[in-house]
């Protein structure tokens, strides 16, 4: 299976439209959204074309393929307008080989700084902790937890490392895809 992984949209209609175009091109089996979908948050600047009401139908059109977890900027009111479950702090997927992918935003389970996993749950060797929250791309083995892959797709709309991005998981491997701005 092919998973497209995105995080931290923060209500940007422009970047959500770009993401939908990428989804149409990539043709993933499932879309993983790691939280912070509609609200920009009190510490972030407004993203380009901040329009949560325009983001809602774009995401709802993909609801049957979305697996989502709650970010620190997501609330019950967001769940009222989105057609897919959003309020879980984590979800677990297993790929074709049985590898566990632990999906979380990162504010509750373990992604404080760049690759900190101090609050990560115990995961079997060979698992992956897939998280957002920091707006910084990561794809590396954990130094603190041997056998644990850390993957952060970066931010769709407010990157803190210079490039808008999402991730792909396919064939047991993670990769980043940079989104270009018009």
Residue ranges and their predicted role:
Residues 107-182:
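Conserved beta-sheet core of the metallophosphoesterase superfamily
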Residues 1-3, 92-102, 143-150, 171-175:
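Beta-strand-turn-beta hairpins that frame and shape the catalytic cleft
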Residues 2-95:
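Core catalytic region of metal-dependent phosphoesterases/phosphodiesterases
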Residues 12, 28, 34-35, 78, ...:
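Aromatic-residue detector
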Residues 61-63, 88, 96-98, 124, ...:
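Short, well-ordered coil/turn elements that cap or connect secondary structure elements
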Residues 42-50, 82-123, 160-161:
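Active-site-proximal segments of metal-dependent phosphoesterases and phosphodiesterases across multiple
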Residues 5-7, 31-36, 66-72, 102-105, ...:
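Active-site neighborhood of phospho(di)ester-bond hydrolases with catalytic His/Asp-centered motifs
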């Amino acid at each position: 299976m092919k998973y497209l992984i995105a995080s931290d949209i923060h209500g940007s209609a422009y970047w959500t439209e770009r993401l939908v175009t990428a989804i149409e091109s990539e043709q993933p089996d499932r879309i993983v959204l790691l939280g912070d979908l509609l609200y920009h948050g009190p510490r972030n600047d407004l993203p380009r074309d901040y329009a949560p009401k325009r983001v809602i139908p774009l995401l709802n059109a993909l609801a049957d393929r979305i697996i989502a977890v709650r970010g620190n900027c997501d609330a019950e009111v967001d769940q009222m307008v989105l057609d897919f479950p959003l309020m879980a702090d984590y979800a677990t997927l297993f790929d074709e080989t049985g590898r566990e992918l632990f999906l979380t935003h990162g504010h509750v389970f373990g992604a404080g700084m760049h690759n900190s996993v101090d609050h990560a749950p115990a995961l079997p060797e060979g698992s992956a902790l897939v998280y957002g929250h920091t707006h910084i791309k990561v794809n590396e083995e954990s130094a603190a937890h041997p056998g644990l892959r850390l993957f952060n797709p970066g931010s769709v709309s407010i990157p803190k490392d210079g490039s808008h991005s999402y991730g792909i998981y396919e064939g047991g491997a993670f990769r980043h895809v940079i989104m270009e701005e018009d």
